[in-house]
Amino acid sequence: MSSRIDRDVINALIAGHFADPFSVLGMHQTQAGLEVRALLPDATDVWVIEPKTGRKVGKLECLDARGFFCGVLPRRKNFFRYQLAVTWHGQQNLIDDPYRFGPLIQEMDAWLLSEGTHLRPYETLGAHADTMDGVTGTRFSVWAPNARRVSVVGQFNYWDGRRHPMRLRKESGIWELFIPGAHNGQLYKFELLDANGNLRIKADPYAFEAQMRPETASMICGLPEKVTPGEERQKANQFDAPISIYEVHLGSWRRHTDNNFWLSYRELADQLVPYAKWMGFTHLELLPVNEHPFDGSWGYQPTGLYAPTRRFGTRDDFRYFINAAHAAGLNVILDWVPGHFPSDEFSLAEFDGTHLYEHSDPREGYHQDWNTLIYNYGRREVSNYLVGNALYWMERFGIDALRVDAVASMIYRDYSRKEGEWIPNEFGGRENLEAIEFLRNTNRIIGEQVPGAVSMAEESTDFSGVTRPPETGGLGFWYKWNLGWMHDTLDYMKLDPVYRQYHHDKLTFGMLYNHTENFVLPLSHDEVVHGKKSILDRMPGDAWQKFANLRAYYGWMWAFPGKKLLFMGNEFAQGREWNHDASLDWHLLEGGDNWHHGVQRLVRDLNHTYRHHKALHELDFDAYGFEWLVVDDNERSVLIFVRRDKAGNEIIVASNFTPVPRHDYRFGINQPGRWREILNTDSMHYHGSNTGNGGVVHSDEIESHGRQHSLNLTLPPLATIWLMREGE
């Protein structure tokens, strides 16, 4: 036995309390010659083998019955490639020694990871299949700077933390190890002796695949190939493009009728994708697909930020789904949750025994609304972990946009907190300066690294400049959900039409701030849960009036400036709230033609008409693209406006939000001529009363509303009509 290895070191190594296994294990130069040491629990016989010849070079002596072997090779002076012939339970196995390989992470990578400027940390950290010195295996690395010891445990070593302790790179706090023979498909975790001497078993923060709940192991999985976005996909995200988003929860869009089980990614590719295309939507937005332990979180409490959930299939199945959407001309938006994470023991919480990813003070690090933990954006490695994740989904899966969840909870330290429950920033303010900088940096990097990709913010306050450049004080998002518009218009629509005249401003107020941001008009999943009722059920009146109100509202929404978003089920007026544990109520579309079919046809026509006419989308964020024609007729609850494209082509939109038809309704227009009714939400095609204007109307040289020419229309009850000028 070498004089350098004393009994205390062996005991610590076997007990899993030794932080530097490479200083003991592997091949070492000693005064007696080359010495090979190995920790092989349960082994009875160990020989050193030279692979070139297959010859036994020397036998290792068992110095501790718990599995510590050591032997000197006196005839050898220079290091050489070797293998170990190990006998376990009477059977000999030829293995490569993990402790004969040098450091894995390049110095530049380690420096960038420590600086928080490694744009793609997932290419270095985590588990990656590799070949080293002709040996195939997997290199593992994990950031845990305060751990006393870290081991890889998995199916390849009986989940025994003694067998594969890792090397600590002190300059970066990263532990690393190459394990020969570990391969794709095998499960693994990291076993940590944490800063307090406690044992923790953690999933890999960078795992590309993970087990489905209730299991929590990570899975070795190759890094997906890069996806290059085509020109059409890039154009589809632009400010002047028609954007109509179908928001989907993959687990409840449709289920198998025989067992209520989810559709797989591939089944969704075959069913959801063609349906969304047929309906005329331009984008699919997916509620979070990151692996998550609790179905009831809808994915908004992820534990596997880099792993698509296994509920619906494999990582490659998810890529198949994305490819199918792109082939159908649909861009894909992913709901992304960088604002918080769950406190499950196997995940990021107190990862190495310290508050590594989260703040230590609960006034900063604990989200009391959701019982989750808040990322410490001021720690470079943490913000780098998140920025890298954004690029990962876009570059490796072809995700076209990220919709960032709960931005307000990120940028305000006092979000949902009472006095005394939060800590001011360094200037005494309520803004989370680190989170703001993180969002700006993420958006900047997306813009620089992924051409055509965009981000969207769900931001519920009046924070100024969410979609403005960081250099002007903004956050740098491309789009922001207009939650104010959504609340105001839904509050208006749920009123009995008799009372709407007193709340006329709820429909007009949105234009006062419309050009402060680049808005998306969202009727999202949040509006059909928690006792809020379905959108249909919020409408007043009897069944006929409920459907008429809904159709009028959709006609108004699709014509109003801003991109469109509709949660699944709303396109056919589902009557009950959304239930994440069940399929949508597709049975409402079974049997004979009914009101639900009418709404579905309307949404389809709205989408296709909206996409066809540039006036409805080209200048959403330019004042020239919108003009009120009638804004003050609150007594009759009538509103009329014009949408306009760059060439000056106009579409007139007129809404009557009472059940009383308005005959001979005259209003001034900008462009005289022949106007065709291109959409009428009261059409019998949508199960309306079929009141209208016979298809075409001609303007009169009669002054009205301060304009020289005017139209005289019949405005159907509880309806919106669109008119297009088609000639003099």
UniProtKB/Swiss-Prot annotation:
Monomer. The active site is at residues 405, 458. One of its GO terms (cellular component) is cytoplasm. Keywords: Carbohydrate metabolism, Glycogen biosynthesis, Glycogen metabolism, Glycosyltransferase, Transferase. The keyword Glycosyltransferase applies. It comes from the Bacteria. One of its GO terms (molecular function) is 1,4-alpha-glucan branching enzyme activity. It comes from Salmonella typhimurium (strain LT2 / SGSC1412 / ATCC 700720). SUPFAM superfamilies: (Trans)glycosidases, E set domains, Glycosyl hydrolase domain. Its EC number is 2.4.1.18. This is 1,4-alpha-glucan branching enzyme GlgB. It catalyses: Transfers a segment of a (1->4)-alpha-D-glucan chain to a primary hydroxy group in a similar glucan chain. Pathway: Glycan biosynthesis; glycogen biosynthesis. Pfam families: Alpha-amylase (PF00128), Alpha-amylase_C (PF02806), CBM_48 (PF02922), GlgB_N (PF22019). GO terms for biological process: glycogen biosynthetic process. Belongs to the glycosyl hydrolase 13 family. GlgB subfamily. Catalyzes the formation of the alpha-1,6-glucosidic linkages in glycogen by scission of a 1,4-alpha-linked oligosaccharide from growing alpha-1,4-glucan chains and the subsequent attachment of the oligosaccharide to the alpha-1,6 position. InterPro entries: A-amylase/branching_C, Branching_enzy, GlgB, GlgB_N, GlgB_N_E_set_prok, Glyco_hydro_13_cat_dom, Glyco_hydro_13_N, Glyco_hydro_b. NCBIfam families: branching_enzym, PRK05402.1, PRK12313.1. The keyword Glycosyltransferase applies. CDD domains: AmyAc_Glg_BE, E_set_GBE_prok_N.
